[in-house]
Regions:
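A ubiquitous short alpha-helical element
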Residues: 1, 74-76, 105-108, 125, ...
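Solenoid-repeat scaffolds in large eukaryotic assemblies
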Residues: 103-104, 133-136, 174-180
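Amphipathic alpha-helical dimerization/coiled-coil segments
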Residues: 87-115
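Hydrophobic side-chain positions on well-ordered alpha-helices
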Residues: 18, 23, 125-127, 167-171
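Short linear motifs at protein or domain termini
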Residues: 1-93, 97
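C-terminal all-alpha effector/ligand-binding and dimerization domain
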Residues: 149-207
Length: 207
């Protein structure tokens, strides 16, 4: 049992990173047997790992259809963006309430904007020093990771937008970061119909 648990924990981490990296598209099925073959393991730890990802909202398990990357409706995606915004704004409030002990460490340079966005939001959550809040941000951040990959081409000036967020964070300018985060998520809520349609089109190309 310990070997199975260890293997399933390893697989959980690998598949989670694959989802964040956009290896699987929203709506795409993940076949446990294929994953087991790729990692040369049995189905049991694979199913444990996939079920754990279902519990965290990164996958869904549909009757007779198996494990899939969630394909949100317009309402669900708006709710997800709204929730992410509220969590990050709350984290900023916690951080602003404390004296600045040291300047935030610079974010490592990377042209991968979805990855850098995940890292920045995770850092904001972690620096709030509130375990439950950081946990909620981490899970919501993970749920949005595959969506960020799928819709990246729809966002104009994404690099400049991320630079504005990082600049406000590095300056410890919480009012500016608050307003920039709100504007960031408002733009995405306005694009929800286009994002959902784009993801549906990409999913149809899988068949």
């Amino acid at each position: 049992m310990n070997a199975i648990h260890s293997k399933s924990s390893y697989l959980y981490g690998q598949i989670r990173r694959d989802l964040q990296a956009g290896r699987y598209l929203p709506g795409q099925r993940i076949d446990p047997a294929t994953v087991a073959g790729e990692y040369r393991t049995s189905l049991t730890p694979v199913r444990f790992a996939l079920s754990r990802l279902v519990g965290y909202g990164m996958l869904c398990d549909q009757p007779r259809a198996g494990f899939h990357v969630p394909m949100p409706t317009e309402m669900q995606l708006r709710d997800l963006y709204d929730w992410m915004e509220r969590l990050l704004v709350m984290a900023c409030e916690f951080t602003a309430a404390r004296p600045l002990e040291a300047a935030p460490a610079p974010m490592p340079g990377d042209d991968d904007i979805p990855k850098q966005t995940w890292k920045l939001f995770d850092t904001i959550g972690r620096q709030a020093r509130h375990g439950a809040l950081h946990h909620a941000i981490k899970r919501t951040n993970d749920r949005l990771a595959a969506i960020r990959r799928a819709k990246h081409a729809l966002i104009d000036h994404a690099a400049e937008e991320l630079a504005d967020l990082e600049g406000a964070w590095q300056a410890h300018d919480m009012p500016r970061l608050d307003s920039t985060l709100r504007a960031y998520h408002q733009r995405r809520r306005q694009l929800v119909p286009c994002i959902v349609a784009h993801m549906a089109e990409r999913r149809s190309q899988l068949h």
